[in-house]
C-alpha cells in the first residue's frame, strides 16, 4: 500500500517582449525598431496531487495493482504581487473553468514460467467543469525472458472524447471529437 502527495510547484517567471516592424515595398524596405524591451515578472503555481495505491503480490506468479490520483486544477494560479487585473481575471477564469479530477488505474501481471502476461486499464476524469470529456483506455502485453535478454510486446488503446466550441459567439454549439489512439510497443532488455 502506498500514499503519496505531490506538492504544488511554484515558478518565478520573467517574460521578455521586444517588437519591431519591417515593411517591404517596391522602393525598398522600411524598418521601425524602437529597441524597447519590456520585462514582466510574475509567479505561477500549479496544483498539488494526492495518490493512493494498493498492490497484491501472489508469490512469484504475479501481481494486481490499483492506483487513484486526485488533483484540484482550480488551484493553478498566477500572481504579480500587486493585484494585477489581468492575472486576477485569469485566475477567476481558471477557477470557473477547471475542477478537481481523478484518474483510476488498474493493472496486473501473471507469470507462466518465462512468459509474463500483462493487462491494464485507465480512466481519467475531465478537468474542464463544463464538458463531459472522456479519457479511458486499456493495455495488453507480454514479455518473454530468454535468460540473457527479455523481449516485451505491448498494445495500448486510448479512447478520447471531447467537445470543443469553435467560436465564442454565434455558432457556439460544440463539436464532438472522438480520438482512438492505438500504440504498439516493442522493447528488448539485455541483462549484464
Regions found by a protein language model. Give the residues of each.
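Outer-membrane beta-barrel porins/channels
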Residues: 1-192
